Amino acid sequence: MSLEIVILAAGQGTRMRSALPKVLHPIAGKPMLGHVIDCARQLQPERIHVVIGHGADLVRERMAADDLNFVLQAEQLGTGHAVAQALPFLSADQVLILYGDVPLIQLDTLQRLLAQVTPDQLSLLTVDMLDPTGYGRIVRDDQGAVQAIVEHKDATPAQRQIGEINTGILAVPGKRLADWLGRLSNDNAQGEYYLTDVIAMAVGDGLVVASAQPLDAMEVQGVNDRMQQAQLERHYQRLRAEELMRQGVTLLDPQRLDVRGEISVGRDVLIDVNVVLEGRVVIEDDVRIGPNCVIRDSVLRRGAVIKANSHLEGAELGEGSDAGPFARLRPGSVLGARAHVGNFVELKNARLGEGSKAGHLSYLGDAELGANCNIGAGTITCNYDGANKFRTELGDDVFIGSNNSLVAPLKIGDGATTAAGSTITHEVPAKNLAFGRARQKNLENWKRPEKIKK
């Protein structure tokens, strides 16, 4: 059967106390709405319709994609009214209704829900709660069949004792939806058009109302304030940490890892505390990551080591290479096999060949280094003239003395050496020694200045 999905994302989120629309607040670095859309896409629907209201332009701008149809709900008059805004665009056999502020919903749960939908049967997602205050209750008959959903404010004292609640997630036969929505009334305590009233209508029309429950109740936890957002963030991170450990990663403290992207890991990886992984990160076998590191959109080849307090973005570390502590590798940085970048070294768009080393206190930008080069402490590539960037190219086996300024554009040949304290402005041929400093002079019997007596 064909499927279309409606995601309700029009709410203001007053309790978030933010100018940002609630559904754009992040979980693991991605807008909550983005998590819901990603899950919805895995169901391969004909179309995904996103109902927007508060902050509509910003939501549309941030989440724009070819497979999304944004539908405006100018006035927020309830969930039933919100779904009705998408009716002109719906033609599928099944319609699944999701929520942009319920970001942890899982594919397996939705598949089980949809499997129960037929032309004469709809299915809703429920969950049992110890404290169901504020939620709509699932009312069943003596045989256990769902009869209705009663919102908390409209519930009788007896109905408020019910622990099974409505999550709001619902899958219905598409051809029935327009009729039900057209019959909704706002004659209730909230003065809104409740989507949940569809359940009683379906029962009255002789349809069966099936139900399913998620394996983890946190899947259907919504976000209304910053505390709930933080709860879901930690729960999500716990799930990601457990997933990594099942794949053979040792986490010294699973509660002190943040994963904010798509991570691929090998076996026997060790990750210390307070590590943040963002974007697309590939970590091969036997990699070691020290504490307090941030790694974004990077590739760590087999046996690479990242030492404490290092920051990598758009970088690649070759097999057996290492960086840190306190190293910064910016986009375009590549370390060859067994290359080494030490403390307080910054690379930007720089490649170090196999076995090359920059041990400490250096900046290498827009540079290409061959194999087995040694960069002395305090060396910088002067790559910017205030208007344009220029490259520095070193051959194999180059030795750069300490405290060198390499003024680009510059080429230094294989096996060349530069003296400590040099400013190198011209090409250095292979196997040459280059001095780029003033000759030392010693003044005999020099007397230091004395303070003037006042």
UniProtKB/Swiss-Prot annotation:
GO terms for biological process, alphabetical: cell morphogenesis; cell wall organization; lipid A biosynthetic process; peptidoglycan biosynthetic process; regulation of cell shape; UDP-N-acetylglucosamine biosynthetic process
Recorded GO CC terms: cytoplasm; membrane
Cofactor: Mg(2+)
Known EC number: 2.7.7.23, 2.3.1.157
Places the protein is found: Cytoplasm
Active site: H360
Pathway per the UniProt entry: Nucleotide-sugar biosynthesis; UDP-N-acetyl-alpha-D-glucosamine biosynthesis; N-acetyl-alpha-D-glucosamine 1-phosphate from alpha-D-glucosamine 6-phosphate (route II): step 2/2; Nucleotide-sugar biosynthesis; UDP-N-acetyl-alpha-D-glucosamine biosynthesis; UDP-N-acetyl-alpha-D-glucosamine from N-acetyl-alpha-D-glucosamine 1-phosphate: step 1/1; Bacterial outer membrane biogenesis; LPS lipid A biosynthesis
Residues reported to bind acetyl-CoA: A377, N383, Y384, S402, A420, R437
UniProt record similarity statement: In the N-terminal section; belongs to the N-acetylglucosamine-1-phosphate uridyltransferase family.
Subunit-structure text: Homotrimer.
Name the record gives this protein: Bifunctional protein GlmU
Organism: Pseudomonas aeruginosa (strain ATCC 15692 / DSM 22644 / CIP 104116 / JCM 14847 / LMG 12228 / 1C / PRS 101 / PAO1)
